[in-house]
């Protein structure tokens, strides 16, 4: 039975997400009963005995769509990527295999589609459509040595297979370096490490510790190249990011554990208005990296922009003007990336939700970006401004 025909989810049975809270994944609905890492002494005990998690597993294993997972159910109905369907899973007893740590909000970029929960730059910027005064000031919980000790103890005493680090920007966070340094050397040689980074910097001391793990995957987040990149990932510079991307991959390859599995790149692409016309460019960028680093393993993830926050619906490709969608170039390459890109556009055309509300949101936000950063999407596509401004 395929994942589209059942309600099973790998995350509920084998994953732990730490982001100050403790949950199976970042998409799950939270409430007042959601556990906090500061209140939990033993992560292994939480994994097996938390009542809400036990209830979730019971529902998912009996084909009941638990409402805590509505983000995935809705996205799947719209034929979009979901964490659940991206990972094949057959029912088996719970066993903690993946530890996913979102260490805080410390970041050096202010990406247009991101929010204050994941970027200290955006928190300071205080965008009017994202105002969230509930965020505490201690945004790097991972730097608390009590939390570091809990995590290191858990990893050293359990059979975790994979650890994922995410920010903010992990290369900037001291707590992450503390964790990957303090894990037993034998454990490191058995444990996969996935680091999600914007590649705006290259912290060699961070990667010096990272390459000691069994297999390292650099999850590099790039949605466009050149000047288009610069109006998506504000405060970033494409030439710097491109250079750092190459430096990271080169370092992973040169310093890999040999013999052992080859390091990997996972290219993270947030699919949105600002890059909907960049299919050919991104396909070429991805293929060029494969040619440059033939020994690396390669994969990509195309994330719908609504994964970055509910306030992003106006930038979802399903909610763009049909005139823009129908005018996009037909890319001839027959790669999997191109096919998925094309399928997303086709679905957006068939299920278009563009309306006056989304139009006004886009116009207002682009004006905001122009005022704050001196550039916006209309700098790149003045013809799109004409369409939105009618």
Regions inferred by a protein language model and the residue ranges of each:
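Leucine-rich repeat
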Residues: 150-156, 180-186, 209-211
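Core AdoMet radical
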Residues: 96-106, 117-146, 158-174, 186-203, ...
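Alpha-helical packing segments of well-folded alpha/beta enzyme cores
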Residues: 99, 147-151, 179, 241-244, ...
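Distinct, well-ordered alpha-helical segments
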Residues: 175-182, 204-210, 278-282
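Conserved C-terminal portion of the radical SAM core fold
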Residues: 194, 213-219, 239-389
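Eukaryote-biased activation of long, low-complexity terminal tails and linkers
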Residues: 132-147, 158-163, 180, 318, ...
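N-terminal pre-core extensions flanking Radical SAM catalytic domains
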Residues: 1-139, 156-157, 337-390
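A Trp-anchored, charged/polar loop motif used as the substrate-binding/catalytic surface
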Residues: 89-90, 144-153, 200
């Amino acid at each position: 039975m395929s994942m589209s025909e059942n309600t099973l989810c790998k995350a509920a049975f084998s994953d732990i997400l730490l982001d100050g809270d403790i949950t199976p994944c970042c998409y799950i609905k939270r409430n007042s009963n959601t556990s906090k890492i500061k209140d939990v002494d033993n992560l292994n005990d939480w994994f097996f005995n938390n009542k809400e998690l036990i209830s979730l597993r019971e529902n998912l294993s009996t084909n009941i769509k638990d409402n805590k997972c509505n983000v995935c159910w809705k996205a799947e109905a719209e034929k979009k990527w979901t964490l659940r369907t991206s990972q094949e899973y057959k029912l088996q007893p719970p066993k903690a295999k993946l530890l996913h740590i979102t260490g805080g909000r410390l970041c050096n970029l202010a990406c247009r589609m991101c929010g204050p929960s994941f970027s200290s730059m955006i928190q300071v910027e205080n965008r009017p459509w994202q105002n969230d005064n509930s965020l505490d000031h201690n945004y790097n919980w991972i730097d608390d040595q009590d939390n570091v000790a809990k995590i290191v103890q858990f990893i050293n005493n359990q059979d975790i297979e994979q650890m994922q680090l995410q920010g903010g920007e992990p290369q900037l966070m001291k707590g992450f370096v503390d964790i990957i340094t303090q894990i037993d050397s034998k454990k490191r040689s058995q444990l996969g490490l996935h680091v999600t980074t914007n590649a705006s910097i290259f912290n060699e001391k961070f990667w010096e510790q990272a390459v000691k793990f069994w297999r390292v995957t650099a999850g590099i987040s790039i949605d466009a190249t050149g000047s288009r990149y610069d109006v998506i990932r504000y405060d970033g510079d494409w030439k710097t990011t491109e250079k750092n991307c190459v430096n990271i991959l080169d370092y992973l390859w040169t310093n890999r554990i040999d013999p052992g599995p080859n390091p990997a790149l996972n290219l993270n692409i947030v699919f949105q208005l600002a890059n909907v016309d960049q299919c050919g460019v991104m396909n070429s960028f991805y293929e060029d990296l494969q040619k440059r680093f033939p020994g690396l393993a390669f994969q990509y993830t195309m994330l719908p922009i609504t994964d970055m926050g509910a306030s992003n619906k106006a930038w979802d490709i399903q909610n763009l003007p049909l005139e823009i969608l129908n005018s996009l170039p037909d890319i001839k390459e027959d790669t999997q990336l191109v096919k998925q890109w094309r399928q997303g556009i086709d679905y957006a055309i068939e299920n278009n939700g563009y309306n006056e509300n989304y139009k006004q949101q886009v116009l207002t936000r682009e004006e905001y970006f122009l005022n704050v950063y001196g550039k916006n999407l209309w700098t790149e596509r003045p013809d799109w401004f004409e369409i939105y401004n009618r």
